[in-house]
Amino acid sequence: MLDPTGTYRRPRDTQDSRQKRRQDCLDPTGQY
């Protein structure tokens, strides 16, 4: 495939990526 790691399309990684990014941005320590 073109993106084996799922860089272009990530159906299931979208939620994970969003939550991880938000946690990193809002609470890096993971308080929230």
UniProtKB/Swiss-Prot annotation:
<dbReference type="GO" id="GO:0007015">
    <property type="term" value="P:actin filament organization"/>
</dbReference>
<feature type="region of interest" description="2 X 7 AA repeats of L-D-P-T-G-[TQ]-Y">
    <location>
        <begin position="2"/>
        <end position="32"/>
    </location>
</feature>
<keyword id="KW-0217">Developmental protein</keyword>
<dbReference type="Pfam" id="PF21899">
    <property type="entry name" value="Tal_Pri"/>
</dbReference>
<keyword id="KW-0539">Nucleus</keyword>
<dbReference type="GO" id="GO:0005634">
    <property type="term" value="C:nucleus"/>
</dbReference>
<dbReference type="GO" id="GO:0005737">
    <property type="term" value="C:cytoplasm"/>
</dbReference>
<feature type="repeat" description="2">
    <location>
        <begin position="26"/>
        <end position="32"/>
    </location>
</feature>
<comment type="function">
    <text>One of four peptides (tal-1A, tal-2A, tal-3A and tal-AA) produced from a polycistronic gene that function redundantly in several developmental processes. Required in early stages of leg development for the intercalation of the tarsal segments during the mid-third instar stage and later for tarsal joint formation. Promotes the post-translational modification of ovo isoform B (svb) into its active form which in turn initiates trichome development and promotes tarsal joint development.</text>
</comment>
<protein>
    <recommendedName>
        <fullName>Peptide tarsal-less AA</fullName>
    </recommendedName>
</protein>
<feature type="region of interest" description="Disordered">
    <location>
        <begin position="1"/>
        <end position="32"/>
    </location>
</feature>
<dbReference type="GO" id="GO:0002009">
    <property type="term" value="P:morphogenesis of an epithelium"/>
</dbReference>
<keyword id="KW-0963">Cytoplasm</keyword>
<feature type="compositionally biased region" description="Basic and acidic residues">
    <location>
        <begin position="10"/>
        <end position="25"/>
    </location>
</feature>
<dbReference type="InterPro" id="IPR054084">
    <property type="entry name" value="Tal-AA"/>
</dbReference>
<keyword id="KW-0677">Repeat</keyword>
<feature type="repeat" description="1">
    <location>
        <begin position="2"/>
        <end position="8"/>
    </location>
</feature>
